[in-house]
């Protein structure tokens, strides 16, 4: 049977020094025959999605040790994309994903950890830890901090979130008093922001890919039910670890669970729930770590056959993550996908032998167990707090309306085509992404004149100064992984377009990316990016752009000969080719330059180019 990795540091006379150091951490002689399980926490006081995690790592550690393991906790970094948004701080967000993945690898390999419990929550932390778990391929389980409760003002029952606060702040007709009311009400509790933004999307996808427990993506951070998820994850990782090292059961390893079929399940869920476009970036990156051939081509194929079964903020103001939980959570969406013949149910998970077994136990539409239904009745208390597990409020009933409710059946889907689509054309030969769930039907086919901005900062100024008019296609380029560097999110430009009344009258195209809070005709991840020689860098002011979502097309009205001539003119610039026309007042540090040096375009997940490392 496989030997514990940790035995490298705990066995043999020559490891007396290592054992002495282990003893200094509290280990005893009898512990040297047990698995050492790394509890990878991400507590920080900078991020509301992580501010409540400080004591949860030790909660998991105690339960691991009660179950027969040795637990050792460490923390990764965590960047708050909302706080880093709209300034140079956003340059660091996506690169932090690689640092998180590397830090988990460094700690786990340096200390020969046998398994991982990944306590994640927000935008880059879950994907970073997922990449690390698949890279290491040792037993692992994910348990996130949980979603925030949706906010609301005292004056209205209308639910609020972070994006509402951003939009109203840019609306000159809104009073200072109303703006402050939104600001104070939008984010009332600890947890990841309350809509189907990137953090919640990724935590939901860990359920579909099989590496977290049912309820992980939707049980509120404040609810007492979430404590049981942490305790169960702790006990489960000890079982998974013993199954691998003692029983030689390789089916429990992350790469066995996160197979091609599992990635298809995750992407199918993402499309069905209208998740953040960032999830595509992160799933592509995770697939590379898992050595799974999963690409934009596969995503495009799925997007054409999967409908939208769930619609949540920012795609509608009616529902937030707490409402998805009330409707049965992610297992309920997966159940509807299964009934529609769109799910692989023969794949294993960390909690069930197969996804079919998981659905039989956890889908509220096929299991009437009162305890199961009680679990999904967990709801918000409406009490501002930074304390985990601080309330036990429950809805009086579940939302089981599959015709008009938050989660729909295939027959009554919000739309027959899903919430995400891949577009191709002479602007994006390797593809770009649009969240169709947030696009009004009236602009699914859009023609407009290009309005060029060579940084997000210039675009924000242009929008606020009324330089963008109805019918324009805002082009924000040189903001990709290399060009930014760091592939900034464009939430402020899209929010300001809304505040100017242009949300349904303009399009936005970028080689950067969008926040999970973005809606409207916002097209990102344009690949290849401008800095890598992509055609988005050849578009000129006033060019006609044609966006055809039904036919998955995006093109500039230029002939191949015209594009070739522009490319030759660009390349004739030598060292100044594929750079912004004017230098940007942007401080790019050595750390960011190092990231840019190896970064691939978005169609590859913006991961490091391994060919450059050979």
Swiss-Prot record:
Pathway: Amino-acid biosynthesis; L-isoleucine biosynthesis; L-isoleucine from 2-oxobutanoate: step 3/4; Amino-acid biosynthesis; L-valine biosynthesis; L-valine from pyruvate: step 3/4. It comes from Hahella chejuensis (strain KCTC 2396). The keyword Metal-binding applies. This is Dihydroxy-acid dehydratase. It comes from the Bacteria. GO terms for biological process: isoleucine biosynthetic process; L-valine biosynthetic process. Binds 1 [2Fe-2S] cluster per subunit. This cluster acts as a Lewis acid cofactor. Keywords: 2Fe-2S, Amino-acid biosynthesis, Branched-chain amino acid biosynthesis, Iron, Iron-sulfur, Lyase, Magnesium, Metal-binding.
